Structures are given as structure tokens and as C-alpha cells.
Amino acid sequence: MNTQILILAISAFLCVRADKICLGHHAVSNGIKVDTLTEKGIEVVNATETVEQKNIPKICSKGKQTIDLGQCGLLGTTIGPPQCDQFLEFSANLIIERREGDDICYPGKFDNEETLRKILRKSGGIKKENMGFTYTGVRTNGETSACRRSRSSFYAEMKWLLSNTDNGVFPQMTKSYKNTKREPALIIWGIHHSGSTAEQTRLYGSGNKLITVWSSKYQQSFAPNPGPRPQINGQSGRIDFYWLMLDPNDTVTFSFNGAFIAPDRASFLRGKSLGIQSDAQLDNNCEGECYHIGGTIISNLPFQNINSRAIGKCPRYVKQKSLMLATGMKNVPENSTHKQLTHHMRKKRGLFGAIAGFIENGWEGLIDGWYGYRHQNAQGEGTAADYKSTQSAINQITGKLNRLIEKTNQQFELIDNEFNEIEKQIGNVINWTRDSIIEVWSYNAEFLVAVENQHTIDLTDSEMNKLYEKVRRQLRENAEEDGNGCFEIFHQCDNDCMASIRNNTYDHKKYRKEAIQNRIQIDAVKLSSGYKDIILWFSFGASCFLFLAIAMVLAFICIKNGNMRCTICI
């Protein structure tokens, strides 16, 4: 009887259990670790870096209309010191300021200079228009050794107005200019602070001096402040420059009686450009859209860790040096331990090892797809990729990097820290704000990447489960799940049959009769095995009862013959 059961079991396993199909996914020996919302250091098959760290130490200017100001400061192009003579009018979409550049020749400063610098950096160049001012009763040829060309001279775009004679009376004057253009006009004027009261009297006559400037949106009065100051460029006097943007059809009026540096031409901005302060060398052989003091950032990544003050079409600056974006599924590498386990399970259960939960059969040999099948049948073993599920996952993952870029990229403008004393508080606020923005975006970047990584892993898990469900619905009662990502098929399934399962063309009705018969045989094996266990337990109980009965009979005979005595004490 037992021999018949054993033969039936062997026959069932040889005929039925020999055919099996399993589902798995691509794996690599060394994956890449990424962070998700719920876990850090999850290993995935593929990932891409989102933080750019490579810098090009040159200003890439190919395809751009570039102007290198050299020794000329950007603000100097509006007033015309000697070093800026060739840049009084220009057109550019990339403006390079150098550290050696200077805005002035006679010592002084611009009021609100950083705002003006910001405007000019975006300007695309400057064109000029004569304001048409004429003067009588004064000299218009004031000059200084601080602004030398071939000899002493002055700012090319300004007029230094002086009394006709030393210590002579400077008449009260009023001059107006109307902007007839369609774009705003940049108007710049200066106030001269003499090195002493005596010098001011010599240049402009005696008495208090007052300059008043007004338009529809601006009104300000200025009084010069003569007095000794440290000499710069051989001068103890100072010229402070002021400016306004005059709207179309608006008029600016100047009223003055000395110490006035008059504008000669109005400036008009040409278009749009990028301006950068850098001493990096220009390179016409490379293209760039993002610049900083150290060169060019050329990258399609959403973030960068090179310079927090880069300008142009730049990746967002973040503090992290690396943020890996998952572009593949969770990796289950076939390491040595896994291979030993697989070898052990092959001995115990065939071709495929055990898994738990999500189908984590990682196959390093599956190189032409993300998801696939392994099978064994009478014709041997085989592996094949499933292109449809692979493409479905890839389609949903493709574009993740582009979506991150869309969320983060914007045109950045540079605000420098070259603030005068009055502007230092504003500068501190700007610096604090910039640092706060970096902190926020560093957190946002980490969060965005973690969200995308979580979605990618969940997505690839979902595609794996969809594939598993597709196979399960096809096989129905013709196969049994083993709980390890595999199906044991209850009929002979050759390579064509396996291919039909993979292609979703499997006809379960065709094999239903054979599968039911084989399933009944397997159930019979299980049932016979159950009866065998009952018989074993019954035999054990009967043996115990027989042993106890024999022992009692022997004891009774011994007591009867007097060979054994039983004494009961109370």
C-alpha cells in the first residue's frame, strides 16, 4: 500500500510539478541608494544625480553678443570717465564686469548704486540722446587731472559748470528736458562737494548753493557740503551722482546756482541682457546660460551646489552635494548569500527561490527589460522579458527629471553686497533673505526628490503586481500559486504554452481537463498521506494498550503465587 502511495506521489510530481512559471524583475550586483519619504538608503537599479557640481572655469560666450568692459565699470558707461570712452553706447546680451573696472575718475559715489547696476545689467545695452541744454554766463569746460585723456578732462556725458571767472557770481539757472521717446530715459546728474569753502567760492562764487530736481514722480533738493577729505586721485573734493528714470512724455527740471554737474545726454536702455562680475576668461567655443563669478554652469539638472549667486537660466542652488533621483525599481541583488539560498532552494523546490511580500525575485540576467518570466518544463528552462510592463513603467518614470527642472528653474538676478553705509541695513536684509531662501530650497529639493523616489518605487511595485495578476487571471484553476511569485502548472506546458502565458493569449479551457485530472491525483496523494498518519497514530496507541495489559496480567499472576505482595497503609 505504502509503495503504491510513493509511486503515485513520484508520478504526480514528475508529470505535474515539473512545469512552473515565475515572475521577477531586473537586478544588478551593485545598485544605487536613494532616499524616500519613509526610508533612507533604499537600493534601486537605476538612479540619476540631480545636483550639478561641475563648473566650467570660463565665461562661455558662444552665440552671444558679449561685451567685456575691462577697466570700465558698468555705471561708468552712463557718465563717461576716460576708461569707458568706447562703451558710451553699446548693445549686448551678455555684459561682463571685471574686478579692475571703475565707474568714476573724480572721487565720489553713485546714490543707490546697486539698484542702478541691476537695471543696467538687464539692459541689453545703452543708447544716448542729447538733452539740448545750452548755457550763458557760465563756463561749461570744467576739467580735472583725475580724469585724464591726453590731458586733464572730465566725464564725457557730463558738464562741469563753473562761474565765468574765479570767485565770480554763478547765476540762478533752470533747465528742463522732456522725454519724447516711448521708453523711460535714465537721467544722471552730480553734486560737487569742494575740498574747502574757499574752493567752492572760487569755482561758484560766494553764498549758499542749492540744487533742486523735480519731475512728476520725483522731487529732491541738494546742498553741497564743502570741507577737507582724504585725497583720492589727487583730489580732496567729491562728486555724488544721483539718477532717476524719466517716463515717456514726462519732464525733468533742474534749478541750480552752482556746484551742479549737469547731464549732457540721456541714456536709453536697449533691451535685455545678463550681467555678471567675473574675472574668468571668455571662451567663444562653449555655450552657456548660467553664469557666476567663477565661470559657467552648464547643466540640465534641477539643482546645483557650485555658487549660490549664479545668474541666468540656472539650476536652483542647494546645500546638498548629492540628491539621487530613482529612475528604476528597488534592487534585490543576487549576492553570494542570495545565490547560495537560490542553490539550496533549487535542490529543495526547483529552479526558483523563496520570496516574501512584494515579488522580489531580482534576476541579474534579465538585461533587456525591467520585468520578466522564468520557466521550467520538459524542454528545459528559459528567461524572457515582458516589454509591455517595462515600457509602461518607463513611460511614467520618463520626464521625472524634466518635471523637477520645471518646478525649480527660473531666471536669477545678481544682487551684490557692495552697499554704501546707508544701504548696509538693506544689504543685511538681502543677505539674510538669500540665506533663508537657500535653506528653504535645500529642504524643498530633498522633499521633492524623496516624493518622486517614493512614487517610482511604488509605481514599479505596482507594475510588478499587475503583471502577476495578469498571469494569475489567465491560469485560473490550471495552476496554483506557491506564495513565492511562482505558479505550479497542473498540465504539461511546452515552450509555446509558456509563450502564450507571457503574451496574454493563454487558453485555459484548452488545458482544463488535463489540469483537473492532475490536480485530483495530487489531492489523492495528500489524502493518502493523511490516512497513513492516522494509521501510525492508531498503531502507536494499540501498542501502548497491549504493553499495559501484559504488565497487569504478569502482576496478577505474581501476586496469586505469593511472589509479589501488595501492602496498603492507611
Swiss-Prot record:
Annotated signal peptide: 1-18
GO cellular component, one term: host cell plasma membrane
Subcellular location: Virion membrane; Host apical cell membrane
Residues linked to a glycan: N46, N249, N335, N431, N503
Cytoplasmic side stretches: 555-570
Pfam family, one: Hemagglutinin
Superkingdom: Viruses
Gene3D superfamilies in the record: 3.90.20.10, 3.90.209.20
Alphabetical list of InterPro entries matching this protein: Capsid_hemagglutn, Hemagglutn_HA1_a/b_dom_sf, Hemagglutn_influenz_A, Hemagglutn_influenz_A/B
Post-translational modification: Palmitoylated.
GO terms for biological process, alphabetical: clathrin-dependent endocytosis of virus by host cell; fusion of virus membrane with host endosome membrane; fusion of virus membrane with host plasma membrane; viral budding from plasma membrane; virion attachment to host cell
Topology with respect to the bilayer: Single-pass type I membrane protein
Stretches that traverse the bilayer: 534-554
Disulfide bonds: C22-C486, C60-C286, C72-C84, C105-C147, C290-C314, C493-C497
Membrane topology (Extracellular): 19-533
Site for Cleavage, residues: R349, G350
Keywords: Clathrin- and caveolin-independent endocytosis of virus by host, Clathrin-mediated endocytosis of virus by host, Disulfide bond, Fusion of virus membrane with host endosomal membrane, Fusion of virus membrane with host membrane, Glycoprotein, Hemagglutinin, Host cell membrane, Host membrane, Host-virus interaction, Lipoprotein, Membrane, Palmitate, Signal, Transmembrane, Transmembrane helix, Viral attachment to host cell, Viral envelope protein, Viral penetration into host cytoplasm, Virion, Virus endocytosis by host, Virus entry into host cell
Lipidation (S-palmitoyl cysteine): C566, C569
Entry function: Binds to sialic acid-containing receptors on the cell surface, bringing about the attachment of the virus particle to the cell. This attachment induces virion internalization of about two third of the virus particles through clathrin-dependent endocytosis and about one third through a clathrin- and caveolin-independent pathway. Plays a major role in the determination of host range restriction and virulence. Class I viral fusion protein. Binds to sialic acid-containing receptors on the cell surface, bringing about the attachment of the virus particle to the cell. This attachment induces virion internalization either through clathrin-dependent endocytosis or through clathrin- and caveolin-independent pathway. Plays a major role in the determination of host range restriction and virulence. Class I viral fusion protein. Responsible for penetration of the virus into the cell cytoplasm by mediating the fusion of the membrane of the endocytosed virus particle with the endosomal membrane.
Subunit structure: Homotrimer of disulfide-linked HA1-HA2.
Protein name from the UniProt record: Hemagglutinin
Native source species: Influenza A virus (strain A/Equine/London/1416/1973 H7N7)
Name of the gene: HA
